[in-house]
Amino acid sequence: NYLEAYSLEKIEKSEYYTNPQCEHYGICGGCSLQDLNYNEQLNQKNVQVKDLFYRIGKFSSIPINNIIGCEQHYGYRNKMEFSYSSNKWILDLNEKDQEIDNTAFGLHVKSRFDKIVDVNDCHINGKLSNKIFQFLKQNLYKYNIIPFDIKKRTGFLRNVIIRQGHATNQILINFIITESDNSCLIPIAKSLVSEFDEIKSVLSSTVKRNSGSSFSDEEKILWGEDYITEKIDENIYKISSNSFFQTNSKQAKVLYDLIIEIAGFKGDEIVYDLYCGTGSIGLHIAKHVKMVYGIEIVMSAVIDAI
């Protein structure tokens, strides 16, 4: 009694259709609902949650409330991971017979692991982070940084992670590379710091060439600290490159306040915050309960929480 289907042709626009802001929408895998008006986006997310609980989880008696929308629909993300690749997605088929630059700095093509859309701008990314992204886009080639070829498993720079504290305006940049020697990144790191006063941390993290993840235990500081801070309510959180933190800082406060409201804490409770990351949920509710225990496997996140 369950089927999945894929769109073959668009005959008529839905009543919920809206023009997506992003010129890459539909090809880029970074977003999936930009062509729906926001209320319908929330409705479709509600449908997905119900499907997870009712059809997959078999929790048929659990009531599912409506999704709480965010005031800021664009520019809300505090973390983006961009790929630097020699496998550019060619939009114009006429280019195939021309000598073209296959280097791309952007996001994966939808449903493709091996092709990167060379994006010009990312509308869900914060404004400051976008400026840094565009600076990198203009300068990576200038500084002779070799892009990664995901098919051949060759090249130096795989990804660039940009994290931004929306309340503090602090920036962390992490270059995900395939070799331990990061000396070729020093000039571009200096250039970044000179251009953007908000940058507090520039790092490099080495991952194996055949790894499908950007997570690394070998992290080196190119400039500054190894973390930034973010403020939610009166709490200031320390965030390192590998630590999990809610990617929408403003909506995180809405979520955390809702947890307190629904839980109805009396002040004598002991709370276990499982998979706590930097401990942002536990620390937010700490003053409302007797004790909070955070449980987390990523050591850098544990250090951040402490």
PLM feature segments, named:
Residues 1:
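Flexible glycine-rich surface loops and low-complexity tracts that mediate binding to linear polymers
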Residues 31, 160, 202:
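Residue-level signal for inorganic ion chemistry
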Residues 4-6:
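N-terminal cysteine/histidine-rich coordination modules
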Residues 154-167:
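Short edge beta-strands and adjacent turn/loop segments
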Residues 180-306:
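Rossmann-like S-adenosyl-L-methionine
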Residues 162, 169-178, 236-240:
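Short, aliphatic-rich beta-strand segments
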Residues 9-16, 26-146:
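Extended interfacial segments that mediate partner engagement and assembly in macromolecular machines
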Residues 114-156, 179-204:
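Internal alpha/beta scaffold segment
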